[in-house]
Amino acid sequence: MVTIRLARAGAKKRPFYHIVVTEAKKPRDGAFIERLGYFNPVASGQEAPLKLDVERSKAWIAKGAQPTERAAQLIRQAERAEQAAQ
């Protein structure tokens, strides 16, 4: 099964997550099919806390990819931000 989930990166005590499409059986930080964007929970100043390709995420969900709870929240958040920008 294909999932959309967060892959952890960054340093100790400074998490940074890539939003990726991957097989459910692969390790959390292992190989992935496509990187859709990133989430930086400790962003400060001019740093963007979330960048996500909403169109690609919708396309993967239409193909049957299952987002995790947190990934689904971030997708909704990115959609709202995109609509507000228009």
Curated annotation (Swiss-Prot):
Top-rank lineage group of the source organism: Bacteria
One GO cellular component term: cytoplasm
Keyword Ribosomal protein annotated: yes
UniProt-recorded Gene Ontology molecular function terms: structural constituent of ribosome
Signal sequence interval, chain numbering: none
Entry's Gene Ontology BP terms: translation
InterPro entries tied to this protein: Ribosomal_bS16 (IPR000307), Ribosomal_bS16_CS (IPR020592), Ribosomal_bS16_dom_sf (IPR023803)
Alphabetic keyword roster: Ribonucleoprotein, Ribosomal protein
The keyword Ribosomal protein is annotated on this UniProt entry: yes
Listed HAMAP family: Ribosomal_bS16
Family: Belongs to the bacterial ribosomal protein bS16 family.
Protein name: Small ribosomal subunit protein bS16
Organism of origin: Halorhodospira halophila (strain DSM 244 / SL1) (Ectothiorhodospira halophila (strain DSM 244 / SL1))
